Amino acid sequence: MKNTTKPCRTEHHNAEGQRDRMEGNKKGETKAKKSVACSHCKKRFSHKAHLQIHMRVHTGEKPYRCDQCGKCFPYKQSLKLHLDIHAKGNPYTCDECGESFKTRLQLRSHMTLHPKYKPYKCDQCEKSYGREDHLQRHMKLHTGEKPHKCEHCGKSFPMRDLLRSHLMVHSEVKPYTCDQCGKGFTLKKSYNEHMNIHTGERPYTCDQCGKGFPYEQSLNLHMRFHREEKPFTCDQCGQSFSQKGAYNIHMKIHTGEKPYTCDQCGMSFRHGYSLKLHMTHHTGEKPFHCDQCDKCYSTALFLKNHIKTHDKAQIYSCLTCGKTFNQLRGLRLHEKRHSLTKPFMCFDCGKCYFTDTELKQHLPVHSNERPYMCSLCFKSFPRMGSLIVHEKTHNGEKPDCRTGSKKSQDE
């Protein structure tokens, strides 16, 4: 039967009802030309009414309210599904473990925890999926295939939904605004994760060491340390990195590139954070305050290192010697020192080390290379560890440091 529904030109609530009825009518849409496009994510629709309903995703509008619990929804159908929860309790039960859920979607999400519901396994990273097409989509991450290209900046993505999320970056509309700092966001997830910074909440927790993170991406990067993944390797010295950002920073050591210039004194830096740290030398700004004492610091890192002096809780203990550590990573590195073997040997002097990282840090001693420079006084060091020890001297009064290419004593 032909649909003869006509748009209402008079009352707003009738138009609302009609749009929701049209939302469920998919038959005509599959045949009709999708001529109306969303200005935010470029998704196309065959009717303007469908586009207006879709816009609620970006505006956050939720006109349908549950009169039992006050929860609001963008669509009438979503409210109907929600009302079933109040009426039925937990009607959906898992056949494997007997746990019950309020919605079918929650049950389906839970079922993926049982191994037999994830038969499609990735042979490269051991991840499992309940559907073959999900595995195929995941495999693009390993093959490097990125068929979905942004027409604005040329950036490519392995999956269409990642492209859609990226397109929001080019949109000037940012419907989600932080009421504490005024920063705007195109995606609600980005807004929610940003709010974790203000609240101090860290909902993404590592299941191996218990460390929490405000961002999901931060947890994903952290997990590479546990898996000992270092996919980014320098082709000049062989050093590997778990994060691309760290790799890019390292490469500037070989190229000598210093793109960040101070507009006060003309000094140039390899890294943006080094310039930012240097600028506090001109301004004298120390915005990071310790809430346990009256000390102030120019960077969050200096404050973080200082706070550790107040924290007496040592969590991880060495079973061999009893030494304690704040981080599990520190304990694991320490435990290697109880081994009788030092498999990494320097061919110039014969000195041996427990890890390849220690050997790589030692090698610049023979080449007179001093790639690690203090961004405050420009003293240079052959090893990162020496630089870190030196930078701690800037936490208090600035020492009388010499700059330039003069050699510094790091032993």
UniProtKB/Swiss-Prot annotation:
Q: Which domain of life is it from?
A: Eukaryota
Q: Where is the composition biased (Basic and acidic residues)?
A: 8-32
GO terms, biological process = gastrulation with mouth forming second; regulation of transcription by RNA polymerase II
Q: Which GO terms describe its molecular function?
A: DNA binding; DNA-binding transcription factor activity, RNA polymerase II-specific; RNA polymerase II transcription regulatory region sequence-specific DNA binding; zinc ion binding
Q: Where are the zinc fingers (C2H2-type)?
A: 36-58, 64-86, 92-114, 120-142, 148-170, 176-198, 204-226, 232-254, 260-282, 288-310, 316-338, 344-366, 372-394
| Residue ranges, annotated region (Disordered) | 1-33
UniProt KW keywords: Developmental protein, Metal-binding, Repeat, Zinc, Zinc-finger
**GO CC annotations on file:** nucleus
PROSITE patterns recorded: ZINC_FINGER_C2H2_1, ZINC_FINGER_C2H2_2
Tissue-wise expression: Specifically expressed in the hematopoietic lineage during embryogenesis; first expressed at the late blastula stage around the blastoderm margin. During gastrulation, restricted to the ventral mesoderm, the presumptive prechordal plate and the dorso-marginal cells of the organizer. At the 3-somite stage, strongly expressed in a caudal domain (marking the erythroid lineage) and a cephalic domain of the lateral mesoderm. At the 8- to 10-somite stage, caudal expression is in two bands of lateral mesoderm which later converge at the midline.
Q: Which InterPro entries match?
A: Znf_C2H2-type (IPR050758), Znf_C2H2_sf (IPR036236), Znf_C2H2_type (IPR013087)
Tell me the PANTHER family matching this sequence: RIKEN CDNA 6720489N17 GENE-RELATED, ZNF44 PROTEIN
Protein name per its UniProtKB record: Zinc finger protein draculin
